[in-house]
Every structure is written in structure tokens, then in C-alpha cells.
Amino acid sequence: MSDFWEKNKGSITSGLKKTGKVGLSGTKYVAKTGYQAGKKNWGGNKKDKQNKKQGEEDVDDELDEEPAHHASYPPRVVDPSYFPPPPSRTNPSQNVAGEHMPRQTYPAQPSIQQPVYQQPVYQQSAYPAQVPQQAPQPAPQQAQYVIQQPPPPPRNPGYQQLPSQQAYEEPAQYSYQQPPPQSGFQQPPQAGYQPTQQTYQPTQQTYQPTQQTYQRPAQPVPPPPSNQSPQQVIQQPPPPPRSGYQQSPPPQVGYQQPPPPPRAGYQQSPPPQFDYQQPPVQQHAHSGPLPPSRPSDQYLTPIQTQSTVHSQTRPYDLTAPHVKQRLEMQSVDLTNLPPPPTHRDRSSPPKSRESSPAGQSQKVHSGSTPPPTYESSQKDIESSMSSSSVTPSTQPALASRPSSISSQSRSNVPPPMPPKPNEPGMVDVSSFPPPPRPRPTPSMERETALKAQDPSTGPTPRGRLAGSKPPPPPVKPKPRNLAAGSGSGSGSLGSGNHTPLASVDSISQELSKVQLKKTNSKYTQEPTSSKLPPPAVPRKNFTPDKQGTPLPPNKNASLKSPTDQQDVNPFERYLKSAVPAENDRLHKPM
């Protein structure tokens, strides 16, 4: 090894140096590129984070600024007391009753407004053209409007701020297109006429679509100029100040109401209320120096006079504590209650148990009856058998007998146990009808006839059928002169009157023979040799010992000799007869 190191020392060191230099340069390059890439990524992420933060801040600023710009928009939560009452389904006459009042003030307007409504409602050119036409007629009434409408400003002085003007002027310009009349606000006399004209026209136009679409329900809407209209105009502006800044959206609400005609006519009143709120706002900006102030009570009273239903309704207060109804249990005096029933009889109180025995027996009879005893049941069975087999006249007595038997057994038997709650009670057998009569058969009729002739015969034993044949006649006693023939018979007769059956039979046979011999009957003559019957032909015995043509052997030929039967196994004999051997295929004789 030492020689190898000494020989290759230079080449090894030079190779290691080269590899180290190359590796160092590679690691430097990788480190530089990685550092640059990480730096770029970190910078990009930092910029993205900054942009996101700036965007979020901008959004927050916009959200913060939106309430200032849109401060005049109303809140979405509105007091429900300002809405008109809904139509009643149960009493539709109330919906029609309110329509008859404004009809008297309407006839003057449709003649003026009908040609105006023929034009599209949303045309911009229709509004300025209508201003000069309608200005002269409602001028005196509009003057009243101007005089009566300024009071709201002192109540909410915050409406005179600039954002409220800008927020209100923009919707007025876009929705109603009234820039030229607004320029006339510089003149105080025209300021009274023009805003009222501008506000009056949209209200009239909101009336007309309701007239044509709803025709009748549109009439409950506040009427156009009349002696009562100024009062209604005064009544309607106050609600918006109570509920908040609600003056800017009226133009939008006025145009959104006509599309839903299918709803009830009571939903038409809100748009005119919002439309009447326009003149106070326009006059707040220009008629700021007018400070005629009225107490707040004067604004509340017209609202109450407008409709009594609004004053009676109260908004639901979520913070109010819930009224809980407490159920009071009635106290019962336990001393006045009767004692509980005993375990033996749950259906009756214990007082009834102390009553007389007659009442108790009646109660037991009406309820469940105890099972009869064995003796009474046997008597009942025998009586039923005898009564059913004798005559039908005994049937009524049979029906009355179980009741007497049951009454006798009840007097000795203790009161019955009550039935279990899950099992039905026992049924009184005496309440059942009597069993049906059995159909008379020939055997029963014959038996009844025999019993009628001989009443001494008892009833048929239980479990036996009445025989169809009458009983045999009694055997006559044997005469004493014939007793010498048989010693046994004389001994038996001498010993007593009762003779055994064998001797009686033999005596009867002898008597019959003697009587037949006396009459010379042909049945008693002994056969002679000439009249003997021919002998019986013996049966041929087919055995193989006989000479002649052998007959085919029988299957049971092996069973003929008794010796073979004892020696041969029966199973082997069965095999020989059932399954022949090889040399006995054709049943040849052995």
C-alpha cells in the first residue's frame, strides 16, 4: 500500500482539489440562485400583503364614508304602526266602506289627468310639459300647501345640512327630471308654486296608475286638491321624521308601487305619503329662514285623526319581559273523600258490602256467577238428558232448573273473586237461552214410544246409543219332567231357582228338538244312505312326483315341505323366489 500511495499521491490530491473546486462553485451557484428566488418571492408576498392591506383600508374607508353620503336614506326597520291596516278577509265590507268617502272629491280630476296618463309614465319630457298646464288651476290650493308645509324643519334641523340636499337632489333629478324648475327657487314667490307643482304631479301620476289598475281600491288613497286635502298633506309629512331620514327614497318608492297590482288596495297609500314628503325637503334648503315652530303634540294629533287603527296598534317590544301564566292547582280536602274500595270487589264501595244478604244475592246474580259444584253439575246433566229424550213439554222446566240450582249453590259458596284487569269477567250462564231441541230421529221416536208403554225402564245410560232392536223376551223356566235326562241340570234346578247359562241353552235346544219330532218336521229327519250328498271332489295335488308333463314350478314350490321350511333360511327362500340364480334363469325345475 505504501508503494501505491507514493506512486499515485500527486494524481489523487490533484483530483480531490478539482472536485472540491467544482463542488464549491456549484454550491455557490445554487445558493445564489436560491437566495435570489427566495428574495423575489418574499418581496412579492410583501407587496401583495401591502396591497391587500391598502385595499382593506380603502374598503373600510368606503364603508365608513357610505353612511355620511347616504345619511338621508331611511333605515330598513320601519315602525309598523305607520302602515295601513291589512284588508280583512272575514269582513270585506270594511274594505269597501272606505272607498265611498273620497269619491266625491275625485270627479274633477280625471278629466284633466286622463290625457296626461296616456303618455308613458317614465318619460322625461312629460313632466316639464305638464307644469304650465296644471299650474293655474291648483294655484290657490298649492299656496295652502306652501303655507302649511314649512313647519317640519324646526323639528329636525339636521335636514338643512348639505349632504341631505345632495342626496335628495340627485334622486329628484334622475327620477323626475326636474332641473329647470329647481332654478326658480331663487325667487321666493315661485318657490312656493314650483315645488308644489313638482311634488303634486308625481302624486297625481301615482294616483292614475292605481285608478286604471285598481280602479276601485285606488280611491282610499289621499284625495287630490280639495278643502280636506291640505289637512291630509299636513298629516302625512310627520311620519318620516319619527322613523328617521326617509325623504330621499320616495321617488323610488313611487315608481316601484305600480308594478304589483295583484296586491290589495291598501298598499297604495304608502307611496303618496312618501311623495308628499318631497316639498318639505326642497323647502328646507331654500326656505331655511322660515322658523314657524309648532309643538310636537300638534303633529301627533293629525296622525291619530287619520286612522284610529294606527293609534291602537303597538309595536312589538323584544326587550319586554314575557308574561308567564301560572297554573294554580286546586287544593282538595282529603277528609271528605270516600275510602278506597277493597281488593275483593273494586267495582263497589265498602258501604254496599254491609247491606242485607238479599241485596247481596241480587248483586251476585246480576254479576258473574261462581262455577256450580260437581253434584249439581251431574244432576243438571242427567236432567237435561232425560228432558231432551222424553217430550218437548219438559223444556220450560229445564230452563228454570239451572237458575234454582245456581241459587242453591250460591247460598253456600263465598262471594266470587274479582276478575283480573286483563281478563274479561265471568258470564252468568242463566242469562243464556236454552239449548236448541235435537231433531227427532226414528230411534228416538221408537224409544219414547217404548218408554210410554213401559214406564219402568230407566233412561239410556250416558255414552250409549239407544238400540234399534227391542230387548229379547224373557226365557221361560224349564219343565221339571225333563230334568231327569241330565243329572247336572236336575241338581242345578233342585239346588235353586237360578240356573247357569249353559244349562239354560241345552234345555232350550232339547225342547226345540222334542217339539219338532212331535210334528214330524223334515228338518229333524236323519239323512239316509240313499240321500247322502255326493262326496267332495279332492283337490288335485300338482307335485313333480306325478308322471306326465311337468308343470312350471311355482314360486313358492320350495315352501311346500315342512322340513324344508324349518331347514332353509327364510331370507334365502325369498332370494330364490325373487332373484333367480344363474342356472335358473328360465325357472327350470331343479
Curated annotation (Swiss-Prot):
Protein name: Altered inheritance of mitochondria protein 3
UniProt-listed GO biological process terms: barbed-end actin filament capping
Entry's localization field: Membrane raft
Record keywords, A-Z: Membrane, Phosphoprotein
Family per record: Belongs to the AIM3 family.
GO CC terms: actin cortical patch; membrane raft
Spans annotated as Disordered: 1-571
Positions with biased composition (Basic and acidic residues): 45-56, 342-354
Main location: membrane
Residues forming coiled coils: none
Protein origin, superkingdom: Eukaryota
Membrane topology: Peripheral membrane protein
Residues annotated as signal peptide: none
Low complexity biased stretches: 108-148, 157-218, 383-393, 400-411
Species of the source: Zygosaccharomyces rouxii (strain ATCC 2623 / CBS 732 / NBRC 1130 / NCYC 568 / NRRL Y-229)
InterPro entries: Aim3
